[in-house]
């Protein structure tokens, strides 16, 4: 930590201004973008320096001081929800002395002679939430946001397994608060799926949980393995309990998930013993924790202590030290993904960190290497502070050998040697050689057979590599001729190393089974850049059948403006995605592949099971902020009733639902004489639909 004991007033003023800007930027990245720029340890250090400076120079405290803020101002993505009781963050304790000071402050504030019982519980590394129930029914779920105003995630929170939608014998009004998280193994599985689908991997479980929960489309959230714990109440019409331990017992009876690993302590020694127990056993827990939370157990004493601007006086978080290791960077290799994106990978001298032996770590992108000043043969720092996958935080410059080599981003693809292209807006380097690039070729086949695409069990990474190397397959189409090619081969697959009669028979059976495929899966399996499962479903819904899909794709490849505008009007599809689709279609082999696959596969027409309603087949546009319903929920309801939700107003639009601050879409609807209704009329419409 920076030595500020002897800092001058002028230096302190300058440093406080710098810290205010830095911490505000880090808050925005963490709370709004779900993309932390620094580790928790680095962030906590900056906040602590800021706090100590303000204590030394109270007359220098800034109007926008980080000590007055909780998180970050919320994004405009969701409907805003004001917390009736602010959801404040906790102050931090970094060592035993900080904890003793916390206990002493309680005694001094309340004028207690004896130790007041402290309730201790793990600090879950997830996303804070609030859920409000009226007469036992869940009516609002919200994120913490900036502590005063959060985001409405009601539709998303309802998708979490075992999250109560209704509570028996509940008070008229009940608010619970807690943490939503993803377990370690679920996180690893999720990242595997992300990789198979050609999507960016999540940096850590917290990012994955936050990114999953803050989806405008709740159906995406529903597919993610989110879990939760409740740990406190907010607004309630009646007192549920007189202490923290009693409250958790009551909430558990209501059906909420409560963390059983907690302890009511009656001395400082018991506090420290519990902290050491969790610190020692944290790796054995299925979820990530980054410390222990200490709260005054008695609610009456909590009320007496109250709050300061940023946090409650009656609670603090005792943080674990970051798990850090140091090892040598042997080399940097470059991987080529399915869509041609290049990713630098650090090859390391094996090191055990956090109970895991690490020999490789992603460097994310080439700008990261420059920003962190990492060179080959450097001794680099690895950290696991809430991360399942260790990350390189930087190089030990003082130990830098004389023979280090600065890494230079490649100009040519390491797989096919074609010229590479830099994509500034995505901060990536890409190979555009498509199927002529062996690495993309391999990754494309891997994607084609993956679980959420054609779902051909028995064709994993090793099997695909083997079949390509032996010349048995060279593109997705060849998979369906594997039986024929194998029969014509001099050496049969079942006689080769790693294979047998039963495994080959099982594989061929799975290939045959996969020939019956839904249109969304088929479109997703093609591996078009930015066409994930959700966008594949959007396209399938628009086209309805394979025949219509291929016909429209051929028109699009010929720059047909009508089909371009039609697709551009779909919610979720825009210019950027259309450019990627056209780039895919510009490769003649891709159109041919789609046609040939269409000849041998049974591609089922798109069908969505829903009751007929007055909205079936209607094109609906939502504009402005709806006062009581989130955009995700209103869109899901419309689609469930058979409507198509469009992103813009056109002459084909049947209905416009206008909320607060509706803009150009509302004006255009008036010009085109399209029916316009408000939220209240919409609720009546769907009730009677």
From Swiss-Prot:
Any one GO molecular function term: DNA ligase (NAD+) activity
Cofactor field: Mg(2+); Mn(2+)
Domain BRCT, residue spans: 610-689
Binding site for NAD(+): 40-44, 89-90, 121, 144, 179, 295, 319
Record's GO cellular component terms: cytosol
Entry superkingdom: Bacteria
UniProt entry keywords in alphabetical sequence: DNA damage, DNA repair, DNA replication, Ligase, Magnesium, Manganese, Metal-binding, NAD, Zinc
Active-site residues annotated for this sequence: 123 (n6-amp-lysine intermediate)
Entry's EC annotation: 6.5.1.2
Statement: the UniProt record of this protein carries the keyword Metal-binding: yes
Coiled-coil regions, chain positions: none
Residues that bind Zn(2+): 413, 416, 431, 437
Database matches in Pfam families: BRCT, DNA_ligase_aden, DNA_ligase_OB, DNA_ligase_ZBD, HHH_2
GO biological process, alphabetically ordered: DNA repair; DNA replication
Biological role stated in the UniProt entry: DNA ligase that catalyzes the formation of phosphodiester linkages between 5'-phosphoryl and 3'-hydroxyl groups in double-stranded DNA using NAD as a coenzyme and as the energy source for the reaction. It is essential for DNA replication and repair of damaged DNA.
Similarity remark: Belongs to the NAD-dependent DNA ligase family. LigA subfamily.
Protein name: DNA ligase
